[in-house]
Amino acid sequence: MSLLYEGKAKRIFSTGTSDVLRVEYKDEVTAGNGAKKDFIEGKGRLNNQITSRIFNYLKAKGLNSHFIEQISETEQLVNSVEIIPLEVVVRNIAAGSITKRLGFEKGHTFETPLVEFFYKNDDLNDPLITEDHIKLLQIANDGEIEKLKEAATEINEVLVNLMDKMNLRLVDFKIEFGRTNEGEILLADEISPDTCRIWDKQSDTNFDKDVYREDTGSIIETYQTFLNKLEAL
């Protein structure tokens, strides 16, 4: 098995099967598009276990992803997909960049979930783009854009209900999708506190990577508490 790709949080390896890949979660955490970076032992284990549980939960609700199975504390097998270079962001509550970009007060609840697209390009700092931009860049066509929006909205509905059972609020999250060789679009990458903004219902305490971004707590303790809540369901 050979290393195919190494990103900020994961390594991707080939397997003996052409359409199956092995993903290894790293003990690294970054913020600000890599401007802040640290090695934190145990983080890979937590992200792998959380993502595996959430992908299995989504599958049970009829929402498929590239995920096949967890094979170790830090590894999982996934179906090979060509990643679509978009971050699909769903916002239920105003926080983060949208408060600066559009002036919403932090904590403002949107009447309906807001779906945004960001172009995955480190050199351009992952800019917000429109549906017309997506077509102009030949990233996806009209039908695929609608599928991405519909899938993101369905995933959001399931995750909001899941977090509610954990006494948490899903503020926002970002997800990625990929195409199979047959052209099917599947949820890919990960869903974890690295990719979500999650608040405690009573205290608004963060259960996500903001504790690292803002130096307000231990990322390991925060993620472990989140996993404990997930396992308790």
UniProtKB/Swiss-Prot annotation:
InterPro entries: SAICAR_synt/ADE2_N, SAICAR_synt_PurC, SAICAR_synth, SAICAR_synthetase, SAICAR_synthetase_CS
Keyword Ligase: yes
A GO MF label: phosphoribosylaminoimidazolesuccinocarboxamide synthase activity
Keywords, sorted A to Z: ATP-binding, Ligase, Nucleotide-binding, Purine biosynthesis
Top EC class, one word: ligase
Catalytic reaction list: 5-amino-1-(5-phospho-D-ribosyl)imidazole-4-carboxylate + L-aspartate + ATP = (2S)-2-[5-amino-1-(5-phospho-beta-D-ribosyl)imidazole-4-carboxamido]succinate + ADP + phosphate + 2 H(+)
Family under the similarity heading: Belongs to the SAICAR synthetase family.
NCBIfam families named in the record: purC (TIGR00081)
Protein name: Phosphoribosylaminoimidazole-succinocarboxamide synthase
Organism: Staphylococcus saprophyticus subsp. saprophyticus (strain ATCC 15305 / DSM 20229 / NCIMB 8711 / NCTC 7292 / S-41)
Gene responsible for this protein: purC
